[in-house]
Amino acid sequence: MYLTVPEMLECTARVVSCTPNKNDGYDLETDRTPFFPEGGGQLSDIGTVYDPMQGFVPVTHCFEANGTVLHRTGKPFAVGEIVTLKVDAAKRLKYTQQHTGEHLLSHAYDVLFGAENVGFHMAGDVVTIDLDHDLSDEEIEAGEKYANELVWKNAPVRIFNVDASELPNLPLRKKNEKLHGEVRIVEVEDGDHTEMCTCCGTHFMSTAPVGLIKVLEHARYKSGCRITFACGVLALEHFTKENAELRRTAAALSVKPDGVFDALARKEEQVQGLNQKLREKNAQLAKLYSEKLHAEAQENFIAAYLPVDFDACKTIAETLCADDNFSAVLFCNESDRLRYICARGKNGALDCRAAAQKINALLGAKGGGSPVTSQGSCPKTAETEQKLREILSEPVQNLN
């Protein structure tokens, strides 16, 4: 019925079979159904099956097996009983908008740029098509505009069946020589560029119910491009969500929505300036700590805990080990972790890999590296802080 009377979303039917499936549910077959089974890139209908004894039982999925439409339910039904099948109208509308919209968008890129649709996928919140051409931003926008103009013209959509032997004589957008028997054709009037494609999905009788076609993003994919888009109700849902995010961002920046980009550019410039100042301060701090630690070192070895972040800790270690004979083991806290770095100059006596292994064993840390430099971390706890004090109380040479 979804093919012959697509506008009918409810009917009574007789149960032909109802068998358990491996998902702890049941696959229900009836003598007729308004439910569309998943296929041709379109998601399946969902809805309910009703009988007086069980009430409304959800149909969570619908699929075709050996030419038979099966409805996945959570409860069994008796063979021969009469049930009422009802499709979720909101979902059917949304899915049909996406599928008819996909035909129009694919048609637009074919007419304008000779780009062939080589893939179509409908997910819960977006739809994608894959084209065999990579298109520019301007070409993507031109195709979107062309498709929407077809929607606004309320162009007629005609659905008919032909024998596969007649397909070579039809101006189909896509050819498929593997088809046989009776084939369903969906045609959209577009002047000299009539859209015609084989299809098993649900469609409107005209283009207006698609409402709107909006490209959300596009990216190079294989040798062509992948276009993500939404139509009708789904397009409105995307716009509503993104508009809310835009307004929230604008409010946080104290600007109007159309001023968000410039405001973010100013913020980025400010952040870059602050980062430069921070780098300069960190360099000064590293120099001061390096001079202090160098003076406190014994036999060109130092082990110390520093109240700085790990980036600063690494900079200080690098500064110290600019002295070819120097070796350093430095610790610091970052968030809820205790971190360490071991480093040496090219003639330094410390084996940093061996030192990391010993520190890991003492602190329960994870890390490693080379004989020249190593690093690691562990959770900061009272126990690890006590172990750190013990490490720092011993000569750093003991880590070698």
Feature locations, PLM:
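A glycine- and charged-residue-rich anion-binding loop/surface
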Residues: M1-N400
